Each structure stands twice: as structure tokens, then as C-alpha cells.
Amino acid sequence: MSEQANYSGTDASGVGLIGRADDSVLPIGMHDFTEAAHRCVLVDKTMFIADVLDCDASIVVCCRPEGFGKSMNLSMLRAFLERPAVGRADRSLFAGTQIWDAGGGRYRGEYACYPVVSLDFSGAVGSGAAVAGVVRDALSSECVRLLPFLEAPDLPRDKVRHIERVARGAANEDEVDSVLAVLIELLEMACDEQVVLLVDGYDAAWLSRAGIRGTRDDGPTELLDRVLFDAIVAAGDSMRLACLMGECPGPAE
């Protein structure tokens, strides 16, 4: 990604910094942008958000080696775009950053605007037969986290119950594997806004190089096709964008 051709910050060096307190530390081993911005000094990479928002494609696949800030960038993207379930977003997190001032502030209109589905499949790497469990646990966790958005009485009750069963761990494999498309549909209806999908380690199951044997006798690529990519296709205009982070192109090609 270009980071808007290395947008020039306020420093003479052209490098913008976030969190310049004298006692700030480097975010070594940290992946949560909000926590890091409050506790550490960060190089301002917020124009990555502009790169994603300005991309002509609605699906952005970012491939970077391990240790190159994939999880931090996704966390930053989520912190900027995610609409809170209750209350108002705190604008101070991005005040003074490059993205906040770029283009005369034109990106501020998308701040805290969208419901965000955030999936982390990175734990599936090397997990062998447990790949399916890692993927399905990630889906279940997001159903739990996003349930507060689905309290509107006019939502289709059968679909809300589908989400609730997955959140409680009472759903069968078919229901879990198909839940992402339902979740995106309901979030768009509940919030009257398109949905953002963020996936960390989308290629993890493929990278594991280990076939899995479940009730469907599927391999990891087929699992991702069914759980992730079929849902992206089904979502259509319900999604503002999808950003997938991984180490290799693999199944996203």
C-alpha cells in the first residue's frame, strides 16, 4: 500500500508521530492501535486508512511478511471506521494525525461511521486439525460482540436467532459456517449503513498446509471459501469494504 505516497507530516523529516510523551515507549509486541496510541510513541501510518478508503476495489488484500504491522494496521482501520454500539466515538484518538487533516478533513466523514466485523484467523497457522475450530470460534466471538447492534425489534427474528445460537455456542457447523453473511445483512439493516469487514490472517488455514477432516470432508481452502469468501460475494452492496491481511495471496486470488 502507498500510505498516500508517504504523506508528509508536520515533522521536518516528513515523519509524523503519535503519542510523543516523554515517557512513551515503542509498541513492541503490541497489536491494538488504541492501546498503543495511549501508551506508546507510534510512527503516524494513518494514511493507510486513506489508501483503503480511496481504493477502487471494494475488497483490499494486503500481503506483508510477519512482523510488518499487519494486525496493528487492521486495528487502526477498525478504530477509525467503527461505529460504537452505544455512546459517541472519541475523536481525540485521531485528532492531529495525518488522516484527520488530509484533504481538508475529507476523511472525517467516515470516522466512526460503520458497523465493523473483525475476524482474526491468524491463530489457525500450524494448528492442523484445529483450523476449523479457530475459524468458527472467531465467528462466534464476533456474534457475541456485535449482538448489541441487533436489538432493534424490526429485524427478522429467525436471522437474529441464528446469530444468537452461534453466540451461545448452540449452533451446528452449518449455522456457524453460514453466519457471516447473515451478520453482515443484519448489521446493515440495524445501522442503516454499509458494513466493513476486516480479516486478520485470512490465509492462515491455507498456510497451515494441513487438511482437516470434518463432517464435510473439506480442506482448509474449501472452509475459507464457504465461511469467508462466499459471504463476501453474498454481501454485495451491503459492504463498504473488506480488508484482508495475510502473508501470502493464496486463497484470495
Residues of each region from the PLM?
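Phosphate-binding P-loop
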Residues: I49-A57
